[in-house]
A protein has these predicted regions:
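Transmembrane alpha-helix termini and helix-breaking/packing motifs in multi-pass membrane transporters
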Residues: 11, 64, 123-145, 219-221
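Helix-loop boundary and gating motifs at the non-cytosolic
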Residues: 1-32, 188-234
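Helix-loop junctions on the cytosolic side of multi-pass membrane transporters
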Residues: 138-172
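Juxtamembrane intracellular "pre-TM" segments in multi-pass secondary transporters
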Residues: 159-196
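Cytoplasmic helix-loop-helix junction between adjacent transmembrane helices
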Residues: 78-120
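C-terminal ends and interior cores of transmembrane alpha-helices
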Residues: 55-69
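Membrane-interface helix termini in secondary transporters
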Residues: 38-39, 43
């Protein structure tokens, strides 16, 4: 949905200002829900949290073609952000501890390398196909993305929860990690300069990739297929 979500929101009676607000709240929500997601994973199990994450994301993307207006899209975007928060850490921990339990730590790096390549390839193909499919039916990219989430949900039922838990969540440990991270940033002039440089560059790069590129291409008059192709090329580069 990367090359078409902006025009889709506009089509659904969401203004540009409201889209900006939705995106801001969505990422704030994702950040806020990172904290309780770790505690819930320890209470309910990482596998169950990932299942809940997939269900929330499926609901969000399945209903997007059927709603219109600011409030419905805001609610669905928040659901999607909670799903992303629940899935991000728990899924990685589930895989990491599974390899750790099998005494195969070296296999983790190979898996991450392979999965990242597949992920990037999927983003490229998804961007190119998304623009084309949108011209056929503007809901089609959302249906197909929902289908991919359903496949992920089904695959997750075959996960085996590892008996070990390498990282036990606690608020104290979470706050200690934040404190140590801040100390690391400000420990020397060099680390401060490097940290602020990456924050500055990352802020520009990520907002451009996730938001401004799409807006600018629409304003410049690129059609749906062209935006999909250019989004795929930018991801490849």
């Amino acid at each position: 949905t990367a090359p078409i979500w902006f025009v889709f929101y506009l089509l659904k009676d969401v203004s540009e200002a409201q889209i900006s607000l939705i995106v801001t709240i969505q990422y704030l929500s994702q950040m806020i829900w990172e904290l309780p997601s770790g505690a819930l994973a320890d209470i309910l199990g990482r596998k169950n949290i990932v299942i809940i994450a997939f269900i929330l994301s499926i609901i969000a993307y399945l209903f997007m073609p059927f709603v219109s207006g600011f409030i419905p899209f805001l609610i669905l975007s928040i659901l999607s952000s909670i799903g992303d928060s629940f899935r991000s850490g728990s899924e990685e921990a589930l895989i990491y501890d599974s390899y750790l339990q099998d005494d195969n730590e070296k296999g983790i790096d190979k898996l991450y390398l392979w999965s990242n390549n597949i992920y990037q390839l999927g983003l490229i193909l998804g961007a190119v196909l998304g623009g084309y499919l949108y011209t056929i039916n503007n809901a089609l990219p959302f249906y197909l993305y929902t289908l991919s989430l359903v496949i992920g949900l089904i695959a997750n039922f075959f996960y085996i929860e590892p008996k070990i838990d390498s990282v036990k969540f606690s608020v104290e440990n979470y706050l200690l990690q934040i404190r140590d991270g801040i100390k690391e940033i400000f420990k020397s002039q060099q680390s401060r300069l490097i940290s602020f440089f990456y924050i500055f560059v990352g802020g520009i790069a990520w907002t451009s990739t996730l938001y401004f590129n799409e807006v600018m291409m629409v304003e410049l008059g690129f059609d749906d297929v062209q935006r999909g192709v250019y989004s795929g090329i930018m991801r490849l580069i």
